[in-house]
Regions:
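Extended, charge-enriched "interface" segments that sit outside catalytic cores
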Residues: 2-117, 391-399, 403, 423
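Ser/Thr-glycine-rich phosphate-binding loops at phosphate-binding pockets of nucleotides
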Residues: 17, 127-133, 181-186
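Gly-rich Lys/Arg/Thr-decorated short loops/hinges at beta-loop-alpha junctions or inter-strand turns
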Residues: 79-90, 144-150, 341-343
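Glycine-rich oxoanion-binding loops at beta->alpha junctions
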Residues: 90-114, 139-141, 145-176
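A short, charged/proline- and glycine-enriched loop
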Residues: 118-122, 302-305
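A short, small-residue-rich loop immediately preceding and capping a beta-strand
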Residues: 122-127, 176-180
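Glycine-rich, small/polar surface segments that engage phosphate groups of diverse ligands
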Residues: 125-148, 357
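A SIS-like phosphosugar-recognition module
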Residues: 146, 159, 167-464
Length: 464
């Protein structure tokens, strides 16, 4: 008979084992780090490291518009897309573009903008991939409890099954097509736009009639020529905003149409409140900075290369995909900003799923598998529905699993670290705060790793 395995390595302590603060609140979010695997002394040393490295100074430089994307010689000013401060970089330019997008969205919602025969628009097809799709889709899905008189359908990859499913039952005379691509060179987007154009043409929607059914969102000023639409049907992006950070601007036009500009403004407002908090809070009390520091610790000290995101709320199902792209495209790199090779781990592999469903699929692996995992468990205190008993069970599951996922047999050397994120009420405002919090975590991790989180050379190589 084989004897049980014995390991010399004891389980690491939890942050909660010390006397310091382990949870912080901001902008309707409560973030609890108590189940992460480090001591209060470890955390204090990490804070000192961040301060010595100039973490907050680097963050301030980004927000103020300095060239932080060194490889492309650009600023990274996604925060300007939601800023309410007239002194922020490009404020007037952003406001002008937003006002124009808002006016268009409201004209579609009110029925003032109609199809070529005078029919009101009932459906929007968003053609885009990556940052031009997953951000708006995450916002749209998270807002499923709000009135959505106009439906949005997201067409991303070149899978004809997806295309057929979207077009089935749609009336082309009541459909608006939004073609979104920062460069307007993304093959999947251009191919899909061509096929949908054929669908419109088959209904007789060509020439000037087509102008009532197709708009574009791009940083390429010639995109309207390529798409054969009037220049006034082109809405701008800028090269100082990366695609995965762009949901706050014109890329969000489908959400503006579906949800209304008042709702979209609340979304921007929540993000701006988080921006102000993160800008001002010291590292030791800054939830984005602490998320980044603990992720850095997990990756470089504990060799935890996996990050699992587990929302216990259907509305945040697509948020997992958004966070996956944000983190892996930003931090999946092996060289520093100066071109030298990084020795050791950088960004983690991000995956996850709806927490309640995942309990019956991969939680077995999380609990007893041979890989260490860092876990973000997200829940909402107020339900997005009227079924109180269902919500009570869901929240009980989330709280119990937060503890179960860090409970291990002491004879095993593998372990998890769990951060719980509790949202008081998932509204457009707190959704904006949540997404901005993660954005700041990622850009700060770029500083900690010494890499550029704003370029994507691997993606560009793949396009070739």
């Amino acid at each position: 008979m084989n004897s049980p395995r014995k390991f010399a390595q004891p389980l690491l302590p939890f942050l909660r084992d010390g006397d310091g603060v382990t949870a912080f609140e901001a902008c309707g979010l409560r973030v609890d780090f108590s189940r992460q695997r480090l001591t209060q002394d470890d955390l204090a040393r990490l804070v000192d490291f961040a301060n010595g490295l100039g973490l907050m100074e680097a963050h301030h430089a980004m927000v103020q518009g300095e060239i932080v994307n060194k490889s492309e010689n650009r600023a990274a000013l996604h925060t300007s897309l939601r800023s309410q401060d007239p002194a922020s970089p490009h404020f007037d330019e952003v406001k002008e573009a937003r006002d124009r997008a808002y006016a268009f969205a409201e004209s579609v919602r009110s029925g003032k903008w109609t199809g070529c025969r005078g029919d009101t628009i009932t459906d929007v097809i968003n053609i885009g991939i990556g940052g031009s799709e997953v951000g708006p889709r995450a916002v749209y899905h998270a807002s499923m409890g709000l009135p959505q008189p106009i439906k949005v359908h997201f067409l991303s990859g070149v899978d004809g099954v997806q295309l057929d499913r979207i077009l089935y039952g749609l009336d082309p005379f009541r459909t608006l097509v939004v073609v979104s691509s920062k460069s307007f060179h993304t093959r999947e987007t251009l191919v899909n736009a061509s096929v949908v154009d054929e669908w419109l043409a088959a209904a007789g929607i060509t020439g000037s009639s087509r102008d009532r059914h197709v708009i574009a969102v791009s940083a390429n000023p010639d995109a309207y020529k390529d798409l054969r639409i009037p220049v006034e049907n082109l809405y701008p992006l800028w090269d100082w905003v990366g695609g995965r950070f762009s949901v706050w601007g014109s890329i969000g036009i489908p959400d503006m149409i579906a949800l209304g500009t008042d709702v979209f403004n609340q979304f921007l407002s929540g993000a701006y409140e988080m921006d102000r908090y993160v800008y001002d809070a010291p590292v030791a009390e800054n939830i984005s900075a602490l998320l980044a520091l603990i992720a850095f610790w997990n990756a470089t000290r504990l060799n935890i290369t996996l990050q699992c995101v587990l929302p216990y709320d259907e509305r945040l199902r697509i948020f997992v995909s958004w966070e996956q792209q944000l983190e892996m495209e930003s931090l999946g790199k092996t060289t520093r900003a100066d071109g030298t090779v990084i020795v050791g781990n950088t960004g983690q592999a991000v995956w996850g799923g709806h927490g309640d469903e995942s309990q019956h699929s991969f939680y077995q692996w999380l609990r007893e598998g041979t890989r260490r995992t860092s876990i973000d468990l997200i829940s909402c205190e107020k339900p997005g529905h009227s079924h109180e008993e269902l919500h009570r069970v869901m929240i009980a599951n989330a709280r119990a699993q937060a503890e179960a996922l860090v409970t291990r047999d002491p004879s095993m050397p593998w372990f998890n670290g769990v951060t719980t994120i509790s949202i008081s009420d998932l509204t457009p405002k707190t959704l904006g705060a949540l997404m901005a919090m993660y954005e700041h975590k990622i850009t700060m991790l770029g500083t900690l790793f010494g890499l550029n989180p704003f370029d994507q050379p691997g993606v560009e190589f793949g396009k070739k």
